[in-house]
Regions:
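Ribonuclease/tRNase effector modules and their secretory precursors
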Residues: 1-80
Length: 80
């Protein structure tokens, strides 16, 4: 993964019109946790992808799953 991250990771989520109510936004902290190397998650059926932008205008795709307590686990972050 390219490394222009650390705290340049300020994401403005792109608004989606019909977002399911309980679906949480992926926060910058979630992403930072992943980039700082948490052990890889077990594969999960309900992965979701959120698109966002970094401040310098690159696109981001954040793939995440929801854990039990509504907590979000980010699986991968790509700048395609």
């Amino acid at each position: 993964m390219p490394a222009p991250y650390h705290d340049a990771m300020k994401i403005t989520p792109i608004r989606h019109a019909h977002r399911r109510m309980r679906e949480r936004r992926v926060s910058v902290a979630d992403i930072r946790n992943v980039l700082n190397g948490r052990p890889p998650m077990h594969p999960s059926p309900n992965k979701r992808v959120q698109m966002g932008r970094t401040l310098d205008g690159r696109r981001l795709e954040v793939m995440y799953t929801e854990a039990k307590a509504g907590e979000v686990r980010v699986v991968s972050v790509v700048t395609p």
